[in-house]
Structure formats: structure tokens, C-alpha cells
């Protein structure tokens, strides 16, 4: 297409309120994120009702800041992209209703975006020349997916968690060893001081050894049992060793399955996405194992790994180019699956 397509994107699926202006799916003019971490920290996790109320408070300001930083006005926008699932229903509704109101008032197309597709699309921002096909590992607090991206907007789910998401397991273990919220970065930090081989925590074993699914509930239970036994015996607990050993089990599972997926699909490229993609151990292990297996491993910069609207703007662009827009009847779908519309 001759004309640049400017998309105003909005993300409010959990506890970040974000707005961004993205051009042609890959160029970010602005990406404003208002985080609620400090608010939810005292509760030990995200409180949905509190998150929704905070989204309502800040969304107008966040959108205005995104336009100001991009040095454009509403009349320069060509379309509105917005997350409509998966996520917390109350949080999703705030961003969705705001986007629908803008779409109606400005008479601009509305493009509903799957949050998981947004995470995958963060790699198109980071790597301007990236094109399908490739394998993508989406790993965050609420989701763990192993996906084969055949073409823009076309996904085949190769594996997913059967219980806890990887990031959810991190949060629970962080809480158990007294590190607080958010758990992922804190476990990652303290793990650097520990011995990853100190404790042998088991990985899930499936009867079907061909599956690329994940399971972290057994690992989580094993860590909790270890901590309980130590506590009952009144023995000292080396938090760094626990964190490092737990992290090694999680990371090796994620990396091994991802490399197996590449062999299955005969591709040599893995894109990693989602909040856990910022994890230093995951990045280092992928870099090492990718090199050994002659597989290119791509990571977005950390700001694009967290929930943000720039990734939603990128995904919205590729949906729009495939002829997909949404009506003003679009509703929030908290349990939206990858590939569903």
C-alpha cells in the first residue's frame, strides 16, 4: 500500500494501561505504559476490581500522552486497535469501550486483537525484516504457548500448559520463599546467587512423549513440599539455591520443547515473547542451546515483553491487511484462545 497506516492501539488486559501509535505494524511512534505494580504489590498479586478502577482513572491521559509523543492528533489516526481478550474481563472492558467510543466518534475502523497474538507481534517491531514461518514461544504470567506461525495471522498451537502458566509458577514460588510480588523478576535476580544443581526438582513426564505441552503444577508442588519439609525439620532454607534450581527446571522445559518444535516444523528460527521473555536465565540458555542447534533465537527488548500497546498496534496492522475489522458489538472475551475471532 502507498499510504502509511497509523494505528492507535490500546491495551488494558491486566494491570498495565497502555496506548501506542504504530505505523505499518513495525514502526513505533509512541508506547505509553502506566503500570499498577506498586498498587498490587501490597496485595501480593493483581486484584481485578482495583485494576479496572485504575484503568478508568488513567486511560484518557495515557491515550493523550501517546498522541502527544507521536506528534499527531486524532484526525491523523487511520484505525483503532484494541485488546479484547484474553485477560481480566473488567480490565478488558475499560480499554475496549474506550476504543469503541473513539472508533464511533472518529468514524475509524476498529480492530480487535488477541492479546497472545500481540505478544507474538512484538517481534515484528524488534526485527523489521522478520517474516513467517517461525516457531514462537509465548511465556507470561497467564499464558504459556508454543506456536508455529505459518503466515501473518495464521497460527498452529503446537503445545500449551496443561495447568499453571510458567509466570504463574514463578509468582507462587516467589511468594512461598518470601520474595513478594512480582515474582518473576525477583526469582530471576536471587537465582543468580544460587546453585541451579543444588536441588533436583522434577519436570513433568507425559505418557505421550511426542507432546509439546507443558505442566508446571507438579514442579510447583515439589518446591512447596521441599520448603515444608525443611520448615518442619527447622532446617535453614537457601532461597537462592531454591530459586536457581526451580528456574533451571522451568527454563530447560521451555527451551527443550521449543527446539523440538523447530525440528518438527523444519524451521531454524524461534521468536520468544511475553513477560517471562525478559528472564535472564531463559535468554542465556536459549542463546547457548540455539547456537548448538543452529537455531536463531529472537527476543524483543524488555519493554516489548511486558504488556504494552505497541505490540497490539503491530498485530492490528496485520489483521487489517488481511481484511479483518471488528464491529462496535465486539465484546471482551476473557478466555479467548489463540487463533479465535
Curated annotation (Swiss-Prot):
Keywords: Acyltransferase, Cytoplasm, Iron, Metal-binding, Transferase, tRNA processing. It holds the Pfam family TsaD. It catalyses: L-threonylcarbamoyladenylate + adenosine(37) in tRNA = N(6)-L-threonylcarbamoyladenosine(37) in tRNA + AMP + H(+). Fe cation binds at residues 115, 119, 307. Its cofactor is Fe(2+). It comes from the Bacteria. Its main location: cytoplasm. The keyword Ion transport does not apply. GO terms for cellular component: cytoplasm. GO terms for biological process: tRNA threonylcarbamoyladenosine modification. It is found in: Cytoplasm. CDD domains: ASKHA_NBD_TsaD_bac. Binds 1 Fe(2+) ion per subunit. One of its GO terms (molecular function) is iron ion binding. The keyword Acyltransferase applies. Its EC number is 2.3.1.234. Substrate binds at residues 138-142, 171, 184, 188, 279. PANTHER family: TRNA N6-ADENOSINE THREONYLCARBAMOYLTRANSFERASE (PTHR11735), TRNA N6-ADENOSINE THREONYLCARBAMOYLTRANSFERASE, MITOCHONDRIAL (PTHR11735:SF6). Belongs to the KAE1 / TsaD family. Required for the formation of a threonylcarbamoyl group on adenosine at position 37 (t(6)A37) in tRNAs that read codons beginning with adenine. Is involved in the transfer of the threonylcarbamoyl moiety of threonylcarbamoyl-AMP (TC-AMP) to the N6 group of A37, together with TsaE and TsaB. TsaD likely plays a direct catalytic role in this reaction. HAMAP family: TsaD. This is tRNA N6-adenosine threonylcarbamoyltransferase. It comes from Clostridium kluyveri (strain ATCC 8527 / DSM 555 / NBRC 12016 / NCIMB 10680 / K1). The gene is tsaD.
